[in-house]
Amino acid sequence: MSKYIIIDSREKPKAIGKILDHFDKNGIEYEVSKLLFGDYMDWNRPGIVVDRKQNIAELAKNCTVEHERFRREMEKAQKAGATLVVLVEQNRYKDRDSWIEVNSIEDLLRWSSPHTMVRGEKVYRVLASWTAKYPLRVEFCDKRQTGRRIAEILYSGDPGLK
């Protein structure tokens, strides 16, 4: 089965240049079209959709200010029988004088935004609730590995994904 990814038309070309480079270098075909939810989906395997987040701050915004909009997106995924994998392009953050590695939502507990009053504990509670209620998975990666991770998620043999 060939690899053919649909990229949501609302993804900004400048933001995804390195992702497209990865797809091109690895023979992954793609086209840009509007998706009902998420940002990346394999044409042949629509049960998994990746929703890319630029950083933890964007994820936090989805959990707070944009809570209702993002909840509706998860409901669309659930109704379609799809798993929504949120891929955050940040896998560490600075906490005072040290770097904290982020491998799971639990690692967000100590996070805080220098620009807003949002605390990691709040983000964690919202995500824990959502992952229990919706077909949602949250992953973190280094920004340089986003294209590779999207392909791995969409083409993995992970039984936890449809």
Pin down the residues of each PLM region.
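Conserved catalytic cores of phosphodiester-cleaving nucleases, focusing on short active-site segments
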Residues: 48-54
